[in-house]
Structures are given as structure tokens and as C-alpha cells.
Regions:
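Extracytoplasmic electrostatic interaction patches
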Residues: 79-144
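N-terminal export/targeting and maturation segments
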Residues: 2-77
Length: 144
């Protein structure tokens, strides 16, 4: 129990650039150049967890990430045709992995949703947003 309490208290401080790189690269967004971990935050409550971080990328890595998103087979330039509530899907527990790639006014976005495979367990929902105006990548992990 003490370990759990300590982990919860120090989780943000123990998060490294390598942890960030692994989470981003899980979605096939490769980071080749040096980058900075600008911000890292997590919050949790009973049954809910939210983790976000922001990376300052090189222009080259930013452009490669945008190209990866825009060249996806399911890329949508008009975000009105995307499922805005992907993480609240009625297929939270069972079903197939879904990835959405789309453009908003401010960012290029890749979302990943994987049902948990077990009734009552939160699915995996992760979002990567690449800024249109800055060399920034924002990662979000939402478990509800």
C-alpha cells in the first residue's frame, strides 16, 4: 500500500523523456531528433485516470508526424466526419482497435482506442495532437 501511495505522489516526477517517446511511438509517430519534455501532468480519481504531456519537437520530427497522420488511409480533413466521442464508445469492453486521423483548426490528431476485453475495465484511449503553429506534440491518455 505504501508503494502505491508513493507512486501516486511521485509519478509525474519519475516520468522521463524515454517514457514519453515510448508512448508516442506506440502510435507509429517516430521521434528521431532531440526533444524537450515541456510539461507532464497526471490526475486520478476512483475509476478515472488522465495523463498528458507536451513535447517540444524539432521541425523535422513535427513535419514527419504530420505527414504520418495526413497519409493515413482514414485521414479526414473535415473533422465533422469523425467520431468525436470515440473514448465513450458503446464498445468499451469488447471489439476491435480503432484509430482515427484527422485535422482540426489548430492541430493534426491521431486517436487510438482499444477496448479492454473485460467487462468493467476501462479501455485504452490515447490522443496525439501536433500543433499547426508550434513545434509541439501533446499526448493525452484518458481512462474512465
Amino acid at each position: 500500500m505504501l508503494t502505491l501511495v508513493l507512486w501516486t505522489v511521485f509519478e509525474d516526477r519519475l516520468f522521463t523523456k524515454n517514457n514519453a517517446k515510448e508512448l508516442v511511438e506506440e502510435q507509429q509517430i517516430l521521434l528521431v531528433d532531440k526533444f524537450e519534455l515541456q510539461e507532464n501532468k497526471s490526475m486520478s480519481a476512483i475509476g478515472d485516470y488522465y495523463h498528458t504531456f507536451t513535447l517540444k519537437l524539432s521541425e523535422s520530427d513535427r513535419q514527419n508526424a504530420i505527414l504520418k497522420i495526413k497519409s493515413a488511409d482514414n485521414f479526414k480533413a473535415d473533422n465533422s466526419s469523425i467520431d468525436q466521442r470515440l473514448y465513450l464508445s458503446d464498445k468499451r469492453y469488447f471489439g476491435t482497435k480503432v484509430t482515427q486521423n484527422y485535422e482540426t483548426e489548430n492541430a493534426y490528431v491521431r486517436e487510438y482506442f482499444q477496448p479492454s476485453g473485460q467487462e468493467g475495465y476501462a479501455p485504452t484511449f490515447r490522443r496525439i495532437s501536433i500543433s499547426k503553429t508550434k513545434n509541439e506534440l501533446t499526448f493525452e491518455d484518458i481512462d474512465e
